């Protein structure tokens, strides 16, 4: 159903943002009628973003639209942390479950996942930011804070994300790419 959107975004060379929207009404377990303890937001959202990324890759969308750019919320969600599990899991599915998703792609699945862009909205979690940086590189990271969703109307997340980026062991040029350069390039703001 999103193919027309992908066509237009590819034509205009503009990114598609992916943000999770899982609500409290989606239970964590089948025996329940809703998610409890804010689990849907804390962990359901990263799962939902990851599931969207998996579907975009294995459905062939990224082959059909080779120049399309997707910006994922929460620094690529679970993909950077579980990237090796993703590789091994697909190898296992192909060898033992006779899955054919991987064979239908033009390149190794992990290469598609590295094509995504990742925002820095990790609430200032330096270790998670380093994991995202290790997977995507500075060239595929864009500044984001999750403003205004914190207990200080957005100021806390903004302050913590800036602090986390400034504490990264990266060059000033890479820091500038993350803070503004990549977004300016992706959105054609300098034209």
Language-model region placement:
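Catalytic pocket-lining loop regions of alpha/beta-barrel enzymes
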Residues: 1-142
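Mid-to-C-terminal alpha-helical segments outside catalytic/metal-binding sites
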Residues: 59-60, 68, 117-118, 122-142, ...
């Amino acid at each position: 159903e999103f193919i027309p959107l992908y066509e237009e975004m590819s034509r205009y060379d503009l990114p598609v943002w992916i943000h999770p929207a899982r609500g409290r009404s989606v239970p964590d377990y089948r025996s329940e009628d809703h998610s409890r303890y804010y689990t849907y937001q804390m962990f359901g959202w990263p799962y939902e973003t990851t599931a969207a990324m998996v579907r975009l890759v294995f459905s062939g969308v990224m082959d059909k639209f080779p120049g399309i750019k997707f910006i994922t919320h929460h620094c690529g969600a679970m993909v950077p942390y579980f990237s090796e599990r993703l590789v091994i899991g697909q190898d296992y599915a192909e060898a033992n479950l006779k899955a054919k998703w991987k064979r239908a792609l033009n390149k190794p699945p992990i290469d598609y996942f590295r094509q995504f862009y990742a925002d820095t909205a990790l609430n200032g979690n330096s270790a998670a930011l380093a994991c995202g940086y290790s997977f995507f590189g500075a060239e595929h990271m864009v500044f984001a804070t999750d403003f205004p969703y914190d207990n200080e109307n957005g100021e806390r997340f903004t302050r913590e994300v800036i602090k986390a980026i400034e504490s990264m062991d990266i060059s000033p040029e890479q820091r500038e790419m993350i803070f503004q350069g990549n977004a300016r390039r992706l959105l054609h703001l300098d034209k």
